[in-house]
Amino acid sequence: MARRKFINAKLKGYNELQEILVEDGVFKKIAPSIEVAADCEVEDLGGKLTLPPYVDPHIHLDYVFTARKQGATNGTGTLFEGIQRWSETKSDLTIDEIKARAIKAVKMEVSHGVQYIRTHADVTDPNLTALKALLELKEELKDIVTIQIVSFPQEGMYSYKDGDKLVEEGLKMGADCVGGIPHFEYCREFGEKSIHKVVELAVKYDKLIDVHCDESDDPMSRFVELLTALSIVEGIGPKTTASHTCSLGSVDNSYAFRMMKNFKKSGLNFISCPTENIYLQGRQDTYPKRRGLTRVKELYENGINVCFAQDSIQDPWYPAGNGNLMNVLDNGIHIAQMMSF
C-alpha cells in the first residue's frame, strides 16, 4: 500500500493547519495530527491553501489553439465574426488534429488544478468530426480528468441544415448534454423553437442541458426566460444550465429582478465567462461601454448557482487563455465588482 502524508495544510472551515493522509491515491484521513509509520512519505505544504480540484464548466476543446489558423483571424473581435471564421475554416479538421490540440489544452488545465471539464463539441458538421474526437478523448483521459460533452450546434439548430438532427445524433453517440444557441438563429421564432427542442431532447434522452443563451448586448434577447419557464414545467431546472446570458447585463432592472424569482424557483444554473465576454461584448458601444457579463453578483446574492469558466484557449473568439481558472476568477470578481466591502 502506497501511503503519503501532507502536513501543514490550510483547509477551508478549519482554524488550525491540518494533516492529510493519502493511501493508494485516495484521501483517507484529515486531522491536526496523524500517526504514520516511519517510512511513510511526508510532504510539508507550508500553510498553503489546499482545495478540491477545480471544475471548468464551459470550454470548447475542439476550438483550442486555432486562433492562428489560416483564415481564422477575427478582425472585429465579435462573437458573430468568430462564428463566421470558424465556419469558413473548420472543414479540413481531422479527428487526430482535434485530439492533439485538445490534449494540449487539457494538460494545461490539469496543471492548473482542474480535474472536471465540460466541453462543447460543434455538431454543425455532417461528419460530426469534433464530437467523435472528443468522445475518444474523454475515454482515453478518463483516469486523469472527468470530461462531459455538450452536443452543441455552433451554427444554429435551425439556421444550419438538419442542425436539430445532428444535435440528436450527438446525444445518441454519447454526448452528455444538449446544447443550443438561440440568439444566433436567423430569427426569434427559430431561437424559441430551438429552446423547445433542447428541452424535448433532454427529457427524451434523460440528458443535461447547457445552452449558449443570450450571448448578446441586445436587451431584447431574452431566451433565458423561455428556458427557465420550460425547466420549471418539466422539473429539470437543476439539470439545466444557461451559459453567458450577457443580455441580462443590458436589460432594465425591473425585468432582471423579476426574473431572479423564476431563476431561483427553477434551480437553473448559470455560467459566466468573464475574460471571454468582456473581450467580445460591447463592440458596438462607444461610451459608456458595457462590460458584457451577466449579473453575476445579483445571481450570487439571490442564492442562484453561478460560476466562472475559461470558454476559449486561443481560438477565433478569444486570442488568449491558458486554462488557469485562478486568472478567470481574478478577472471575474473584478469585472463583476464582487470585492466591495
Summary of predicted features, one role per range:
Residues 65-98, 174-177, 223-241, 266-269, ...:
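Active-site gating loops and adjacent loop-to-helix segments of metal-dependent hydrolytic enzymes
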Residues 129-141, 160-269, 286-308:
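Histidine/acidic residue-rich metal-binding segments in metalloenzymes
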Residues 10, 208, 229-240, 276-280, ...:
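His/Asp/Glu-enriched, well-ordered alpha-helical/loop segment
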Residues 50, 67-120, 128-140, 165-172:
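Alpha-helical scaffold segments that flank or form the walls of functional sites
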Residues 9, 25, 47, 58, ...:
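Divalent metal-coordination and catalytic microenvironments
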Residues 85-100, 150-161, 182-189:
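Active-site mouth loops of central-metabolism enzymes
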Residues 1-37:
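N-terminal metal-binding scaffold of metallo-dependent hydrolase/deaminase domains
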